[in-house]
Amino acid sequence: MKPKIFIDGEHGTTGLQIRTRLAERDDLEVISIPEAERRNKDLRADYLRAADIAILCLPDDASKEAVSLLEGHNSTRIIDTSTAHRVHPDWAYGFAELAKGQRERIAEARLVANPGCYPTGAIALVRPLCDAGLLPADYPVSVNAVSGYTGGGKQLIAQMEDRNHPDYLAANNFLYGLPLKHKHVPELQLHGRLDRRPIFSPSVGRFPQGMIVQVPLFLSELEGSPSLAKVHAVLTEHYAGQDIVEVVPLEESAKLPRVDAEELAGKDGMKLFVFGTEDHGQVNLVALLDNLGKGASGAAVQNMNLMLGK
């Protein structure tokens, strides 16, 4: 029998992307609740319990409700794309390249929390340095990022695309999360292994999909004052053999005049760059990804495949 997959929230931005991806698969059976019955709690519970894997593409509170509907029904495994369970100790963090053994943890887990798009890039940069002892856990990390506007869901998409929308946004780029209380910070701190709460400054650009995440560091404040080559070597070793995360060669990065946030739009990969100058003792770590790819639906499908042993 084919594994049954239920996408709870398949009409949202991430849910639609996952549904489209799975439509091409003949090794799965995707079960869908009739659109008119989406708010029927009892019927939703039936679909959740009928699934081998339920992928939750819902706001935090709705995801928590969906999980509660499965209490006492442990045969359904869950992938939650919301922020609700990303720092919960009972949930496996769904970043397969996070550390040695993480793929196996995801594959064996019943509960998997899909990472946020911004933390995916930031954690990909800082976690290997922390694990290698280069980045002190109390380093005052700052993360700057720009995302395509689809990351804000249907409401922001409408505000950016519909000129007749009452709250139309004409800006080509805008900062948000100005009080430094973005909901992604807790998972960034926990899974990045940072003792000090990082400063996170997100922004949105006038492009649908794509993302750049930057983490600037002072080499002199890292353990042993490493060279750019050493920092690059740590990242390269950490992601050796990974087919989704690519560490761009140092000499190739040095020749780049720019990095395009949309380069990986529509793709599931992630590129990591090491830029900087040893003359001034500064390095800028950069992650490039699709906010809806490795940053959302692509990661969810990757986690689903791991859970199915594929």
UniProtKB/Swiss-Prot annotation:
Record GO biological process: L-arginine biosynthetic process
Localization annotation:
Cytoplasm
Per its UniProt entry, which superkingdom is the organism in? Bacteria
Q: What is its EC number?
A: 1.2.1.38
- Tell me which Pfam families the record gives: Semialdhyde_dh (PF01118), Semialdhyde_dhC_1 (PF22698)
In the UniProt entry, which residues are flagged as the active site? C117
Instruction: Write out the pathway annotation from the protein's UniProt entry.
Output: Amino-acid biosynthesis; L-arginine biosynthesis; N(2)-acetyl-L-ornithine from L-glutamate: step 3/4
Query: Gene Ontology cellular component?
Result: cytoplasm
Matches recorded under InterPro entries: AGPR_AS, AGPR_type-2, NAD(P)-bd_dom_sf, NAGSA_dehydrogenase, Semialdehyde_DH_NAD-bd
What job does this protein perform?
Catalyzes the NADPH-dependent reduction of N-acetyl-5-glutamyl phosphate to yield N-acetyl-L-glutamate 5-semialdehyde.
Entry protein name = N-acetyl-gamma-glutamyl-phosphate reductase
Question: Which species is the source of this protein?
Answer: Brucella ovis (strain ATCC 25840 / 63/290 / NCTC 10512)
Designated gene of the protein: argC
